[in-house]
Each structure stands twice: as C-alpha cells, then as structure tokens.
C-alpha cells in the first residue's frame, strides 16, 4: 500500500515557496544523469571535434553550469542556493552520450533540481549543436532523442 504524502508547496490557499528558514545548513550533494541518442557518425564527429558549431562537449559543460546556477530563476518554487561546486561529465558510446552533473552546496534545501536542470540543458545544448548533422533529408530527427533523465544519487551530511 502506498502512503500519500502531503505536498509542501500547496495548501487550500494556493501555491507557495516553502519556508526553509528554520532548517539547519547541511552539506548537500546530488548527481543526475541522462542520455541523448545520436547517429554513430555524429558521435564520431563530436569525438574528432569536427562539428561546425564548435566543441560540443565543452559548450555543453558551460551550458550545464550556467543552468545549475540559474535553476531558481527557471523553476518557480526552487530556492536560490549557495552552490559550492558543479561537475559535468560525459560518457560517449557508439549511439549515445550520457551526461552526468553533480551539484554541491552548504544549504537548507537540496540540489536535486539543480542537477536535473544541468543535465537537461547539457543534453539540449548537444542536440542544438549537432542539429545540422542529425537531420534527415526531410529536416526531421528520427534517431535523436533525450531520455532517462533522473537523480542517481543524493546525500546530506551534517556540518
């Protein structure tokens, strides 16, 4: 049997941002990952740094970091957080790139949404940079897909 939890952001008065003022500052870490499916030829062009728009993975790293820092501006009920670090990594396989983003902060609320936002924007940036080589003759993207974006690890450590 599933136990229903109450939402912290809504009540009979409407939507609100949760007050975390009385919570202790805790060292928080979250890691998220996701995949983008691409043609093998596209992956090889990325590896060889031959994509016309520039270095795909370096650009996606920068985009992910910017997205993490601005998550509170994009997602309405997220708090601005005192981030202490962001790591962005990529694994390239024959048909996909896996993006992994780890976010750290010493704060009163978690960094999961920041990690998920970073992964999402990294993958969207990759797609944007390879559009010209991923399109088919009709201008469609039959093989390109973003999938499996999820939090794979979350930690809280008392200071």
UniProtKB/Swiss-Prot annotation:
Which pathway, per its entry?
Cofactor biosynthesis; molybdopterin biosynthesis
Active-site residues from the entry: 128
Question: Which molecular-function annotation in GO is an example for this chain?
Answer: GTP 3',8'-cyclase activity
Q: Which GO terms describe its biological process?
A: Mo-molybdopterin cofactor biosynthetic process
What SUPFAM superfamilies does the annotation carry?
A: Molybdenum cofactor biosynthesis protein C, MoaC
Cite the Gene3D superfamilies for this sequence.
Molybdopterin cofactor biosynthesis C (MoaC) domain
Key word Ribosomal protein present: no
Keywords, comma-separated and alphabetical: Molybdenum cofactor biosynthesis
Q: CDD domains annotated for this entry?
A: MoaC_A
What the entry lists under InterPro entries is as follows: Mo_CF_biosynth-C_arc (IPR023047), MoaC (IPR023045), MoaC_sf (IPR036522), MoCo_biosynth_MoaA/MoaC (IPR050105), Mopterin_CF_biosynth-C_dom (IPR002820)
Q: Which Pfam families match?
A: MoaC
Q: What does this protein do?
A: Together with MoaA, is involved in the conversion of 5'-GTP to cyclic pyranopterin monophosphate (cPMP or molybdopterin precursor Z).
Name the protein family: Belongs to the MoaC family.
Q: What is this protein called?
A: Probable cyclic pyranopterin monophosphate synthase accessory protein
Q: Which organism is it from?
A: Methanothermobacter thermautotrophicus (strain ATCC 29096 / DSM 1053 / JCM 10044 / NBRC 100330 / Delta H) (Methanobacterium thermoautotrophicum)
Q: Which gene encodes it?
A: moaC
């Amino acid at each position: 049997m599933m136990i229903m939890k109450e939402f912290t952001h809504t009540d009979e008065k409407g939507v609100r941002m949760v007050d975390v003022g009385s919570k202790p500052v805790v060292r928080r870490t979250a890691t998220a990952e996701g995949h983008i499916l691409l043609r093998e030829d596209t992956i090889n062009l990325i590896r060889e740094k031959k994509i016309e728009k520039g270095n795909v993975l370096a650009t996606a790293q920068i985009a992910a970091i910017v997205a993490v820092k601005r998550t509170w501006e994009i997602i309405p009920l997220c708090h601005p957080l005192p981030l202490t670090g962001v790591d962005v990594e990529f694994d390239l396989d024959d048909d996909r790139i896996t993006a992994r983003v780890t976010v750290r902060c010493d704060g009163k609320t978690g960094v999961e949404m920041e990690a998920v936002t970073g992964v999402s924007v990294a993958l969207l940036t990759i797609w944007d940079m390879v559009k010209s080589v991923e399109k088919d003759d009709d201008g469609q993207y039959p093989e390109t897909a973003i999938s499996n974006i999820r939090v794979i690890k979350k930690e809280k450590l008392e200071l």
